[in-house]
Amino acid sequence: MKKRKLVFAITAITVFSAMMLTSNTKAQAAAKKTYTITPKLSPYKGKYKKAKGYYNSTTKQYFAIRSYLELLEKKGGGKLVIKKGTYKIPNVLYIPSNVTIELKDGVTIKKIMKTKAKKMKPSGGIFELLEPSKAKKKGVHGQYNGVHDVKIYSTGKAVIDQDYQGKTGQNCIALVMCHNRNVTIEGITFKNMKYGHFIEMDASQNVNVNRCTFTGYKASKRHTSEAINLDTPDKKTRGFTHGWSQYDCTPNQNVQITNCIFSNLEKAIGTHQYSVEKYHTDISISDCMIKNCVSGGIEMMNWQRVSLTNEIYEYWKKQ
């Protein structure tokens, strides 16, 4: 009798384990589901199409991509494949955790500063690494506990075009990251910057920027607009002004910038203000071409454990 009970117990445990494994596998499969975006695609299941004062032909592409990013947040992650074409983005698109975005050859993500919508104003950003559901909340993230495991890459020639947008008091930035970890940006051309940066990197850990090109600018008043800006979320310096941060002055840690081209810019990479005793650490820049930058190549303010390898610097413009 004892032997039968033991066999039954082992069998029950085995069946339960198999059920749990199957459940986990299904959950992982669901999280990794792929969705394809095209220039003419409507929002997921018609979401936002009846939003009067918001949805129109100018905002359609924005709401289409936004609806799928919101879907991926609910599903715990997944992949967006963005097909060839031009996508005009008037407002910020928030990217949640465990998301991969593949930009196909011929994709242009273009910043526009108009909506033609009565209830919706344009904003200066394009992408931000933050859960869409937390976009309007205050102080939700600190340290490196925000959105994680994000990859944005191109399989060919894809462009994020800031179109020289922005003005005093309203920076235009292609990608904002803060309180993030495990982020990869690869194979993308960023172009046409004014009043801002291409990448604003604050309080982020384990970031890899590889095989990207950063090019083109119109002069800002301060002449220190870096293509990639390393900063801290600090209320005193106001280097980061997004309310969802806890403003804990967390620096960046373990950043690798490799095989990139920086040309015709004010500055390639750097930090132009700092938080006291908060050091960006383990910063590696290798095999990059830096040319024609007005205010210099790399500014290492409050950096520790820095590695510069095989950089090539060419002719500097004078402002």
Each language-model region and where it sits:
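Bacterial N-terminal signal peptides that target proteins for export
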Residues: 1-10
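Right-handed parallel beta-helix/beta-solenoid
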Residues: 30-65
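Short glycine/acidic-rich loop motifs that flank beta-strands on beta-rich extracellular proteins
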Residues: 88-92, 111-114, 162-166, 171-173, ...
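Bacterial N-terminal signal peptides
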Residues: 11-19
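Short, T/G/N/S-enriched strand-turn elements that build extracellular solenoid repeat scaffolds
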Residues: 65-73, 88-97, 111-113, 139-144, ...
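Sec-dependent signal peptide cleavage junction
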Residues: 19-31
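N-terminal extracellular ligand-recognition/capping segment immediately after the signal peptide
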Residues: 62-66, 76-131, 135-138, 158, ...
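Right-handed parallel beta-helix
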Residues: 104-106, 148-161, 181-192, 205-218, ...
